[in-house]
A protein has these predicted regions:
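A flexible loop/linker signature enriched in serine peptidases of the S9 family
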Residues: 44-57, 73-81, 95-107, 121-127, ...
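Short beta-strand element of the alpha/beta-hydrolase
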Residues: 448-458
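Residue-level detector of Asp-centered blade-edge/turn motifs that repeat once per structural unit
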Residues: 35-36, 87-88, 133-134, 230-231, ...
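Non-catalytic accessory segments flanking enzyme active sites
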Residues: 32, 139-141, 165-197, 201-207, ...
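Hydrophobic beta-strand positions that form the internal "hydrophobic ladder"
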Residues: 40, 89-92, 138, 235, ...
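Active-site-proximal cap/loop segments of hydrolase catalytic domains
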Residues: 473, 478-479, 486-679
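Short loop/turn segments that connect beta-strands within beta-propeller blades
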Residues: 63-66, 110-114, 197-200, 258-262, ...
């Protein structure tokens, strides 16, 4: 059954969109709107292929004049990111490394954006920051050594200087994490500090002294991990202090601390699962935060908790079976605006604080960021046929129903052809409804058959939905002449928690059944799919599934692409960094339950591999170590299976550098063209 209206496609005369054009697109992010709703700030990242990096700039849009072009702020020339408005809307703060010493510091400018003035002059990089509502201070994060007492900053600078002159490169570790994501531990922790900016000359105040945890959390945390109260008297933050059990723990808690320093208080000690993203209501009377229920399970449902001034905690919309991604208080404090995955889309919802009533405010696509204004919403939204764009909603109703496009960024896309797409559904494992998307090739001709790229998402608790990606983008395949099929198998997010839970300890059976049934349904329903010319591709869990398919479902595939996939499940159980993930997903440790790791271990079936496979892995991938890719490639070579190994020495679990991404796509499409050739 079809569950989505077929999306429009550019005219047949338009040139197909290609991966080369995708990698050169300007990328919008970082939405910030002033308190009056007059101006919107956003970041645009251009790609400099010669320098092999992205170059970011701040842009300003006057929301009162939607048809007037946005303008680039002059201060961007020195490098500018993470812009925030002062509460009065007169000053723009941002991070830049333009000053003496090259450290990242907070700077400011006025609305003209012509001249930058340095605000902080710290000897350490500022990692994240917030402006106190009274504008007398900032709260910033700095990487310091937690064992430092007294002046943490000076002590850290001294220890770093001592390390710099040490001619030995050896590092002794006495606990894990020894490395995380793509970085080896150096003994520092992200800590919060109050920095006076009122001219008083007050020294920085440590807000988390001695805390053996990171605020913001590593590796991806930002200023969403802490919040300053409207009266500028307190700071709430989320952190995890777990000692030697840190890699096994998801027990993040919400703390409060006076902004002037003093003891910090754990407000969520009773919950041993994940508490995150503190947000205080405009009247300062209610703390909202996200919370999970099950310790050790990172993909549990995030629900909203409300804590009043008396310490009473209630769950908001307890029966709403969606997991909260981002959220913010409404201007009047009567509602929370929530972003959550929902059946292949990432939508904005409003939840009434008094009743828990949930109302959908967007209809499709992927809401990337939003901000409520007096007249509606400013938001960033992407889709399967559009990168993130800045929009202004019309008053009332659904925000993405005929919104106003506020920028001319990537205007050339209107002249390119994209593949039309639609969502479908079928009965998968346990006769439960499973959804997927099919994308036609750009320039599709009725009656013609096309080779198929069968894309398998990672996570595994993730989704290949109606949103844009610069790494796994189905439109890059459509532009190269391939049709695309993507299945949100059991374990995917946005379909309820039970659906998400179904994959744990079942990596190789329930999702595989969904993929097999989804493939059969797609072939039966869409005659333009050429089932005799098909390839399966995936990354992370998708890479695991490709390795698993190589020994369990070979028939449909002329070739395979495995990016950062698990090859040996037992080895993965010891070499990955976030142990809570492995032990939850496998149902125990390698010590206690080795048979569970072997139940879906691709290595044990490598003797049966025969389908040509391209293996891709990177040296800085500490989530799924490069040895997994080397192992898969070695097995293929030992069996005499046509194979290739693409290695990046300077990438992590994701391939991000422009030239490397270009190489990735060129290699992958060369592999596909060899075996199922769209050209």
């Amino acid at each position: 059954m079809l569950s989505c209206i077929i999306c429009a496609v550019a005219s047949a005369q338009a040139r197909p969109f290609t991966y080369q054009e995708m990698l050169l697109l300007d990328r919008i992010s970082g939405l910030s709107v002033d308190a009056t709703g007059h101006y919107a700030l956003f970041n645009v990242r251009a790609t400099d292929m010669e320098k092999n990096k992205g170059v970011s700039a701040l842009w300003l849009k006057d929301l009162s004049e939607p048809t007037t072009p946005e303008r680039k702020l002059g201060v961007s020339e020195g490098g500018a990111r993470d812009a925030q408005w002062s509460p009065d809307g007169q000053t723009i703060y941002f991070l830049s490394s333009r000053g003496e010493g090259g450290t990242a510091q907070v700077w400011k400018t006025d609305v003209s954006g012509a001249k930058a003035e340095q605000v902080t002059r710290l000897p350490l990089d500022v990692g994240a920051y917030r402006i106190a509502p009274d504008t007398k201070s900032l709260v910033v994060s700095l990487a310091v050594f937690p064992e430092c007492t007294g002046d943490e900053i000076a002590c850290t600078v001294k220890k770093q200087a001592e390390r710099a002159v040490d001619k030995s490169s050896g590092e002794v570790y006495t606990k894990v994490f020894v490395r995380h994501w793509d970085t080896w531990a150096d003994g520092t922790r992200n800590h919060l500090f109050r920095i006076a900016i009122d001219g008083s000359g007050a020294q920085p105040v440590a807000l988390t002294p001695g805390y053996d945890g990171d605020v913001p959390s590593k590796p991806f945390g930002g200023n969403e991990d802490f919040f300053i109260t409207p009266d500028s008297r307190s700071v709430y933050f989320s952190g995890r202090e777990a000692g030697t059990t840190e890699p096994w723990s998801t027990n993040f808690d919400i703390y409060s601390v006076p902004i002037g320093g003093g003891p910090f208080t754990n407000l969520t000690a009773e919950n041993k699962a994940w508490d995150a993203s503190p947000r205080v209501s405009p009247d300062g009377k209610t703390l909202a935060y996200k919370a999970m229920k099950r310790p050790g399970f990172e993909a549990d449902r995030f629900e909203i908790k409300l804590r009043d001034v008396a310490g009473k905690v209630a769950t908001l919309a307890a029966d709403w079976d969606r997991s909260v991604d981002d959220f913010a208080w409404s201007r009047d404090g009567k509602s929370l605006f929530v972003v959550a995955g929902d059946v292949g889309r990432t939508r904005l919802f409003k939840i009434d604080v008094s009743t828990g009533t949930v109302t959908a405010l967007s209809k499709d696509g992927h809401i990337d960021a939003f901000h409520e204004t007096p007249g509606g919403f400013v938001f960033l939204k992407s889709a399967l046929n559009s990168p993130s764009q800045l929009y202004l909603s019309k008053p009332g109703g659904v925000i993405d129903m005929d919104p106003i496009n506020l920028t001319a960024v990537n205007a050339k896309l209107k002249d390119l052809a994209f593949g039309a797409y639609e969502q479908f559904q079928f009965k998968g494992w346990n006769e439960e409804t499973v959804h997927g998307f099919v994308v036609k090739p750009a320039g599709y001709v009725e009656g013609k058959k096309y080779p198929v790229a069968f894309l398998i998402h990672g996570g595994p608790q993730g989704s290949f939905g109606d949103g844009w990606s610069y790494r796994w983008n189905p439109q890059s395949y459509a532009g190269a002449g391939y049709a695309v099929v993507m299945i949100d198998f059991h374990g995917s997010t946005g379909y309820g928690q039970a659906f998400c839970d179904a994959i744990s300890q079942h990596w190789g059976d329930r999702p595989l059944e969904d993929l097999q049934k989804g493939w059969a349904y797609a072939l039966k329903t869409y005659p333009f799919l050429d089932g005799d010319r098909a390839a399966a591709l995936g990354a992370s869990y998708g890479g695991f599934m490709v390795n698993w398919i190589a020994g369990n479902w070979k028939a449909p595939w002329k070739c395979l692409v495995s990016h950062d996939g698990v090859f040996d499940a037992r080895s993965m159980g010891f070499t990955t960094e976030e142990m809570w993930f492995e032990e939850w997903e496998q149902g125990g440790s390698v010590f206690t339950d080795p048979a569970k790791y072997d139940a879906f271990n691709p290595m044990l079936q490598a003797k049966d591999w025969s389908v040509p496979m391209l293996v891709i892995h990177s040296d800085l991938d500490y989530r799924i170590g490069v040895e997994q890719g080397i192992g898969a490639f070695t097995a293929l070579q030992a069996k005499g299976v046509p194979s290739a190994f693409l290695r990046f020495p300077d990438e992590n679990h994701w391939v991000l550098k422009p030239q490397n991404s270009m190489k990735w796509h060129k290699t992958v499409f060369g592999w596909l063209d060899t075996y199922i050739g769209a050209h």
